[in-house]
A protein has these predicted regions:
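C-terminal output helix
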Residues: 106-115
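Two-component/phosphorelay signaling modules centered on CheY-like receiver
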Residues: 11-29
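Active-site residues of response regulator receiver
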Residues: 52, 82
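Acidic catalytic/metal-coordinating carboxylates
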Residues: 12, 33, 59-65
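Conserved acidic carboxylate
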Residues: 8
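Short amphipathic alpha-helix used as the core "switch/output" element in two-component signaling
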Residues: 39, 61-74
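Short hydrophobic/Thr-rich beta-strand motif most characteristic of the beta2 strand and flanking loop
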Residues: 25-34, 39-40, 102
Length: 122
């Protein structure tokens, strides 16, 4: 069982993401924004982080930079969650250091397989 940290401000999206992940036997830690992200990362040590790009306050790119600076080599895979599906958006996210990229609304099968692909073997 992996621990997955989800940073998502939309309660409906969080509910769906949590359901898809927990039905596969994984634990979810959810945050509605990035204010508690660093301390939650240190306390929970998740296997993977799903980080919404558009959050109130600091966006996903700003939060990723903070994580990279604070955790460096200890940073788990961080997958971008975004409604941005324009040409070049995925490349921009991957260039910034995101490990993966998922667009919303999600396809449940793609979402699940992407999350599973980034969970390290037990």
């Amino acid at each position: 069982m992996a621990k997955i940290l989800i940073v998502e401000d939309n309660p409906d999206n969080m509910k769906l993401f949590r359901a898809v992940i927990t039905i596969r036997g994984h634990q979810v830690v959810g945050l509605p924004g990035g204010e508690q992200l660093l301390e939650t990362m240190r306390a929970e040590t998740p296997s993977i982080v799903l980080l919404d790009i558009q959050l109130p306050g600091e966006d996903g790119f700003q939060l990723l930079k903070k994580l990279q600076a604070a955790l460096a080599d200890a940073l788990p895979p961080v997958v971008a969650l975004t409604a941005h599906a324009m040409s070049g958006d995925e490349a921009k996210a991957l260039d910034a250091g995101f490990t993966g990229y998922l667009t919303k609304p999600i396809d449940v099968g793609t979402f699940a397989s992407t999350v599973e692909a980034f969970i390290p073997p037990a």
